[in-house]
Curated annotation (Swiss-Prot):
Species this protein is from: Homo sapiens
Record's protein name: Methyltransferase-like protein 22
General function of this protein: Protein N-lysine methyltransferase.
Principal subcellular localisation of the protein: nucleus
Entry keywords, A to Z: Methyltransferase, Nucleus, Phosphoprotein, S-adenosyl-L-methionine, Transferase
Source species, domain of life: Eukaryota
Gene: METTL22
EC number: 2.1.1.-
Length: 404
């Protein structure tokens, strides 16, 4: 479904009316996508890297040695409270005007007069070009060290990439795909969920977790840095094989925390897990026992784009929650996508609206065994991955508790 231009432009994606491309890949320059192979169905597979905005020391302190999530020191952009000029706090060069000096008590009228010359024209006080000027005409320019929240244009993929191994997540993925293959791409909801997992290390550390609709496996890779075991599940041998390759590419991350990632098939439209040993990525009886005996966390990212599949996801969540021996928490990420529809002649969010109705139905479920508590998660936690955190990106938490 992806058409490639010949020769030098072979990594340029040609859009078709029946393909979908994630914004994560759309806004990434072409030269950062390294085409590595063709998958079993003939789709080009690309390799991209995602940089974690933390230092090696922070990783060691917070992850490998069991620190709390508050120990993770991130690189944060300048605060919006420092004024539109971007001046650091305390510099005295905010929105007050360059002619004002710290500690001077002046009125607005005096400020206006100070900025006019003898002819009544505006006299703009300019900062010197460099702090080394011997006779500056005004206050010296403060040294500012900007924080760049993006990869450099000359980024190199592969072993030559700069940074420690714990700073980089390498993911194989496809580009523009039909709707049924969107799991082969990386979506913003997976990056938001990964940020939350890194923030709530106390929730994930030492647990057994299961991801539904894992796709490329990015969220499972992050979870494995803290969890004891992560069951990374989806359907389709080709997708699961690519997911397995991504687990191997990032095995050093899971090894730091001692976690294990098991890639397995889990079909939401079936009640039972596949145990046929002849089927790739099937379940053993030992794995099924471990899943039901120890799992306390379920999570899923960006799997709510089709109403029938959304219904299947919630049925699977309910079924798993009833079979687990322990109370569990489910973390779901979703992007509220706005579309203009001819049927309504208005901007609607039908897939999101159906997702919310399913949340409400689950919360109202009363079978005498489990009680489901649904609550939104405020996306105010630190951002450790480079992506655009839109207002339309949401996290929801579902707590399944036994009825007492």
């Amino acid at each position: 479904m992806v058409q490639l231009a010949p020769a030098a432009a072979m990594d340029e994606v040609t859009f078709r009316s029946d393909t979908v491309l994630s914004d994560v890949h759309l806004y990434t320059p072409n030269h950062r996508h390294l085409m590595v192979r063709l998958n079993s169905v003939g789709q080009p597979v690309f390799l991209s890297q995602f940089k974690l905005l933390w230092s090696q020391d922070s990783w060691t302190d917070s992850g490998a040695k069991g620190g709390s999530h508050r120990d993770v020191h991130t690189k944060e952009p300048p605060s919006a409270e420092t004024g539109s000029t971007g001046s650091p706090p305390g510099s005295g060069h905010g929105n007050e005007g360059f002619s004002l000096q710290a500690g001077t008590d002046t009125t607005g009228q005096e400020v206006a007069e100070a900025q006019l010359d003898e002819d009544g024209d505006l006299d703009v006080v300019r900062r010197p070009r460099a702090a080394s000027d011997s006779n500056p005409a005004g206050p010296l320019r403060d040294k500012v060290h900007p924080m760049i929240l993006a990869q450099e244009e000359d980024d190199v993929l592969g072993e030559e990439a700069q940074g420690s191994p714990h700073d980089i997540i390498r993911i194989e993925h496809t580009m523009a795909t039909p709707l049924e293959d969107v799991g082969k791409q990386v979506w913003r909801g997976a990056l938001l969920l990964a940020d939350y997992i890194l923030f709530r290390q106390d929730l994930f550390r030492g647990c057994t977790a299961l991801e539904l609709g894992a796709g490329t496996g990015l969220a499972s890779i992050i979870a494995a840095t803290m969890a004891r075991t992560v069951y990374c599940t989806d359907v389709g041998a080709d997708l699961l094989s690519m997911c397995q390759r991504n687990i191997a590419l990032n095995s050093h991350l899971a090894a730091t925390g001692g976690g294990i990632v098991r890639v397995k098939e889990l079909d939401w439209l079936k009640d039972d897990l596949c145990t046929d040993p002849k089927v790739p990525f099937s379940w053993s009886q030992e794995e099924i026992s471990d899943l039901y005996d120890h799992t306390t966390i379920l999570f899923a990212a960006e799997v709510f784009y089709d109403d029938d599949l959304t219904d299947a996801v919630f049925k699977t969540l309910s079924r798993l929650a009833h079979r687990l021996k322990n109370a569990c928490t489910a973390i779901l990420s979703v992007e509220k996508r706005l579309n203009f529809t001819l049927r309504h002649l208005d901007v609607t969010c039908e897939a999101y609206d159906h997702f919310r109705s399913c949340l409400h139905a689950l919360e109202q479920l009363a079978d005498g065994k489990l009680r489901f508590v649904v609550e939104p998660v405020e996306a105010s936690f630190p951002q450790l991955l480079v992506y655009e955190r839109l207002q339309q990106l949401e996290l929801w938490k579902i707590i399944a508790e036994p009825v007492t």
